[in-house]
Structure formats: C-alpha cells, structure tokens
Design a protein with these regions (language model features):
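Intrinsic disorder
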Residues: 2-182
Length: 182
C-alpha cells in the first residue's frame, strides 16, 4: 500500500522524531521532504526523505548507521507500510548514505578483482536489503562476476562468484566479535 497522504505521513514522522528527542534526551534536528521532489543519496526516489542534523548526529551514524536504519524501520512501522515498501521512506544524516554507497562501490570493485584473479567466491558480511541491492546493481556493471544473496534474516549476505560458476561453494561470513544485530 503506497503512502496516500504524504503530508499526514510527514506529520506522523515529525511527531515520532519530536517524541524521540524529548523522551530520549536527544538533540536532533530534522527536515522532511515529501513527494516527487524527495530524493535520497542512493539515487532512489522515496516518497518521504528525512535529513537529520544536530549535536547528537554521531550517535545516528556510528556502527555503520544502525540507528539510522532502525529509525527508518520504525518509521515504516508507524506508517503501517508493508515491509517490501520500506524504500518509500529514507532517513539520512550528514550525507552518510552517499558516503556509504561510495564505500560499497569501492569494496565491490575490489571484491570483483579478487574473485576474477583467484576464481574463488567472496562473501560480504551480512547487511540490510537496501545495501545488498546496491551491491547487486554495482556488480551488474562489472564484468567476469555474478552475485547472489544467501542466508536468512539479519544473517543474509551477498556472495560474488566468477562468471558462470555460481555452483561453487561459498564460505558464509563470520560476524565480528562483540557485534550483535537484532
């Protein structure tokens, strides 16, 4: 179900963020863009874009932007969107997503080169569906490799294979110690 009333949806998100600031003791400012003019750093065109700023911004972007992703997830729940429609809402902070997209592209290019030279599949650590999709799109433009997602839930990851060899076994990535993703 798409977002029918963008202004009402933006008001709900603003209310959530105001409550988060008040009850959480956070100092975050936010700007919400709605409609066809909304756009995010990943080149997608969500219905609602929320740009965060303020003194507590580092809290939002640390640990690979986990809090940023969590805020998006909560916003999707508040708006009662289907999980597959999560891309209709985008949160960003200090251009974090554009920088992360650039980091993913560079990592993908390095992984592709490694797979082409070695002939051995490469597995990225588990990541959210948006980042996996970004990687799949980057790899589409790179020759000599193919990709596939594997695993389930928060352990889902992207594997890179030599072209035509997706039947090769891939070693699933290991989570770093002290890292937990719920």
């Amino acid at each position: 179900m798409p977002i029918n009333d963008l202004q009402q949806a933006a008001q709900k998100i603003a209310g959530f963020l105001a409550t988060l600031n008040k009850l959480g003791g956070l100092r975050l400012k936010y700007r919400i863009s709605a409609g066809s003019g909304a756009g995010d750093a990943e080149g997608m065109a969500p219905a609602l874009c929320v740009e965060l700023a303020g003194p507590d911004l580092p809290l939002v972007t640390q640990r690979h932007g986990e809090l940023l992703l969590a805020l998006e997830t909560i916003a999707v729940q508040i708006l009662r969107l289907d999980q597959r429609e999560g891309d209709l809402v985008s949160f960003d902070a200090a251009n974090f997503k554009a920088l992360r997209a650039q980091e993913l592209r560079l990592t993908a290019e390095t992984a592709a080169e490694k797979v082409r030279k070695s002939g051995v599949p490469f597995a990225f650590p588990p990541m959210n569906s948006r980042e996996r999709r970004q990687l799949h799109m980057v790899f589409r433009d790179l020759e000599g490799v193919e990709t596939a997602s594997s695993g389930e839930g928060p352990g889902r990851f992207l594997a890179v294979y030599p072209e035509g060899k997706t039947n090769l076994p891939v070693v699933p990535p290991v989570k770093p110690r002290g890292f937990s993703r719920r």
